[in-house]
Regions:
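Basic/polar N-terminal segments that are highly enriched at the extreme N-terminus
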Residues: 1-10
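A structural motif shared across PLP-dependent enzymes of the aminotransferase-like
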Residues: 95-110
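Short N-terminal binding/cap micro-motifs at the start of the first secondary-structure element
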Residues: 18-23, 49-51
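Mid-domain Rossmann-like dinucleotide-binding core that forms the NAD(H)/NADP(H) cofactor-binding site
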Residues: 127-165
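Conserved beta-strand elements of the Class I
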Residues: 12, 38-39, 154
Length: 165
């Protein structure tokens, strides 16, 4: 059986809930992607309120925990069965499990999309979770009855991430 290549990356982890001082920069191993997975090297990652809620324990995570829900970067490797992404592709994601506060990671390819050429890494990383939230609010939250093209919709707290899209 061939040996699997192991590389390492730096990542932000917490061992207990707390303020920013709870975050630690550590070295962690990452391997090759398995079937249905990709390895992505981050160029930018998003910061969201849910990340703060995870860090403070408001939304508890099993500890120790990695933080971060969205990022953008370059696909380094793809696992068996992945057809929509290739090594060298620019890509972005918003996904669980948390862990985007790192230089690189292996994750499910089904959660990753190609980043269009006209979108830089910073924008790609910052818009994924907010964009999915806006799409959910528009398409899945009731009531939808009576809405038609041209109607105006008000998002409360528009100074947050969704309001800045």
């Amino acid at each position: 059986m061939p040996a699997t290549r192991s590389i390492s990356t730096r990542a932000i982890r917490i061992d207990q809930p707390g303020g920013p001082e709870a975050m630690r920069l550590i070295e962690v191993p990452i391997g090759e992607p398995g079937p249905g997975e990709i390895r992505i090297r981050h160029r930018a990652c998003g910061l969201n309120f849910i990340d703060v809620y995870h860090r403070t324990g408001l939304y508890p995570l099993p500890l120790p925990a990695s933080l971060g829900m969205e990022a953008a970067g370059i696909v380094e490797a793809v696992g068996e069965g992945v057809t929509h992404l290739h090594a060298g592709d620019r890509a972005a994601y918003a996904s669980t499990p948390p862990g985007s506060y790192c230089e690189a990671r292996v994750m499910p390819a089904k959660c990753v999309v190609k980043l269009p050429d006209g979108i830089d890494f910073e924008t790609g990383a910052a818009m994924m979770l907010k964009g999915l939230t806006a799409q959910y609010l528009l398409k899945k939250t009731l009531p939808q009855e009576g809405l038609k093209a041209g109607d105006h919709i008000l998002f409360h707290a528009a100074a947050g991430g969704v309001g800045l899209i």
